[in-house]
Amino acid sequence: VISKWGARTIAHETPYTLEQVRRLASFSYAAGDQGAAISSGSFLTQGMIVAPCSMRTLAAIATGQGDHLIHRAADVVLKERRKLVLAVRETPLHEIHLENMLKLSRMGVSIMPPVPAFYHRPATLEEVVDHTAMRLLDQCGIHVDAAPRWSGEMTAVK
């Protein structure tokens, strides 16, 4: 599901078209499709990652609003006690943002800002993105080796 603002983010921040991104997915649903499979708890999923997660979406999820498929699908994930991961990227944060994050965290939601890691000494932006994506997938129990993992040893300077 790609929101209107998600589509704008893709256009502004990536070299991909919206259609190219949709083709990467096994399934794609319109943001207004409240009848989509993911809007029902009987449709089995491992969980859900909202990336990026706006403060509007965070607030809607925290308050149980379901006027958008992303909000409804997140609500379903919560009620079914599945894994929900929110990649919030707003800064700085004010008290309402933090209260909404705390409320969701207490419900078992993983709040995971896409903060880059540098211990693996990434040489490209793609390596930074791959590492963040790998960490997000790890949260849902989906393990891919898209980037080096911390081994306890310092990486030599490239």
Each language-model region and where it sits:
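A cross-family phosphate/adenosyl-ligand binding-site feature
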Residues: 1-85, 91-158
